[in-house]
């Protein structure tokens, strides 16, 4: 993961995020979220939620899943995914289409593979890597927790009428892993198209890590100055009447300005990141607990951070 692109490709500056540093941040956020959820659930007795004596497993699985969530991401990031799919459509798909089917069964398989082979995706590739290519010998719980999206690459993207359309918006696994995924779902009593509960934590930790990361890296590279970042954010907050974020930005900006010039940039983003992460972890933990029944069933069709569109956190 170290040399894989987060935003800036082939970066030699160790301060700029790669997929490795990003993954370490996500794992840390996931651990924080899991602990916060457990602290709240303990107030009502963990027996009620079936988590008694499982605190460490809950936390460690959340952290582990988040640490390897991007393992399938190719060099050069999402741009590479598009390039790979384009290459496959031009070079491989015609060969598959020209293959003569001797039976209806082979023709049906060919039809499935035509969709599957041109839907390369980092999420689906992660499942392939941990189960086939590198054989990490993970438990069923660990494997299924990495399955962020529940649609096979060979299946059509659902429309808005599907009650699980968010969980199926991107490919989550390839046809080559279909039997294993179904076996795990059957063993763990997870319905088709549904998600493992801890995966919601991993997704929220990933979303939270993006809050300031790209802006921070842009300033580090000299693309933007600290003052430009401040002016852009405050201008947007004013336009959107966003008081929550504006208050945080102003407070941290003034605090950073009190430090000596060389440290203003680092201090601003450190203060800002800590404040935002603390607030957003509390928010997603509350959403997780309030919707724990749907999350336990795996039918909660939202990202935790985006669920309540009326909240100040969603607007921020």
Identify the residue ranges that each predicted region occupies.
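Low-complexity, highly charged intrinsically disordered N-terminal segments
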Residues: 20-21
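Sequence-structural signature of the catalytic-core scaffold of metal-dependent phosphohydrolases
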Residues: 1-4, 13, 24, 28-29, ...
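C-terminal subdomains that position terminal phosphate/3'-OH groups for nucleotidyl transfer/ligation
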Residues: 244-316
